[in-house]
Design a protein with these regions (language model features):
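Anionic-ligand binding region
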Residues: 193-218
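General beta-strand structural signal in soluble alpha/beta enzymes
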Residues: 23-25, 57-62, 103, 121-126, ...
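A C-terminal functional module that forms or caps the active site or interfaces directly
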Residues: 221-289
């Protein structure tokens, strides 16, 4: 069997050899989530947050026919300036690698690459999930199935609030994915701390999350964990303020005939415009918050405390 084309940055290679805590970071937030140069600045800030919390960041992307686990600053800038990067999930990652194209990793693809690199913790903004109207469109993110099969603990501010959150939780339950609200009972809704939906599980410390991750491995259970970490209170957009904006953006997407992988980037851009940029500020705050928690979990996995 051919070994996967995986290249670790010097920082990640050194951390791997030394058994240090490493946090995987996705790259679609860079290529599809924000405009340049804000995307580059945010990526640097997220990496700095992981380092400040005592772990090593490993931003993951496909470039030059290889999976890069950890990007130096030049590669990070190249990616941030790439207008036509593929948005990669399980289905198209091999094709992107084989063609030598540039691709940014979604939650699903980042989990696959992190697992190949021996990284057990991953921080993102929000996972994908069941889209509204999925009962007719069947539009369900591959992120959910990946959580059921790849043993990586994913820290996110819940699922993106543009999705059908009750159905997303139902599918995660069907797939046997532990959904853990961190520090509260309510499942967070990305820009808002509360969705009005009770999370199946609650944990209050990084050590608890790390112990549960280890126990899943000991039991031979496939899949990872979703740690739903609420956005900091000072940065949130309350549910009553964001729901009408989401509804308006969804109506615009329907009228414009937006479908498939184009839906999420379109909606996020529309909501950015409708909130006067406030949604992007909240997005940055929640990603930084998730990076801090993921670093704490990664450290607990390494130290056993």
């Amino acid at each position: 069997m051919t070994a996967p084309p995986l290249v670790r940055s010097p920082e990640v290679a050194e951390a791997t050899a030394a058994g240090r805590a490493i946090v995987a970071l996705e790259s679609t937030i860079i290529t599809h989530g924000m405009p340049y140069p804000q995307n580059l600045e945010t990526a640097r800030r997220v990496e700095a947050e992981v380092r400040a919390a005592g772990a090593v960041p490993a931003t993951i992307a496909v470039m030059d026919g290889a999976i890069h686990v950890g990007l130096d600053d030049a590669r990070l800038e190249d990616l941030a300036r790439t207008p036509d990067a593929m948005k990669l999930s399980r289905a198209d990652m091999a094709a992107c690698l084989a063609a030598g194209r540039t691709g940014a990793t979604t939650v699903a693809a980042t989990m696959i690459c992190a697992h190949l690199a021996g990284i057990e913790t991953f921080a993102t903004g929000g996972i994908g999930g069941v889209h509204r109207g999925a009962e007719t469109s069947f539009d369900i993110s591959a992120d959910l199935q990946e959580l059921a099969r790849t043993p990586v603990t994913v820290v996110a501010a819940g699922a993106k609030a543009i999705l059908d959150l009750p159905k997303t939780l139902e599918v995660l339950e069907t797939f046997g994915v532990p959904v853990i609200a961190f520090g509260q009972n309510d499942f967070p809704a990305f820009w808002s701390r509360a969705s009005g939906l009770q999370a199946p599980l609650r944990m209050d410390t990084a050590a608890e999350v790390a112990r549960a991750h280890r126990m899943r491995g000991a039991l031979g259970l496939s899949g990872g964990q979703l740690v739903a970490n609420p956005i900091p209170a000072e940065a949130e957009i309350p549910r009553e303020a964001i729901v009408p904006v989401i509804e308006a953006a969804l109506a615009d997407a329907t009228a414009a005939g937006i479908a498939a992988k184009a839906v999420t980037p379109y909606l996020l851009d529309r909501i950015f415009r409708l909130t006067g940029g406030r949604s992007l500020e909240a997005n940055i705050a929640l990603v930084l918050n998730n990076a801090r928690l993921a670093a704490a979990i990664a450290n607990s996995l390494v130290t056993g405390h």
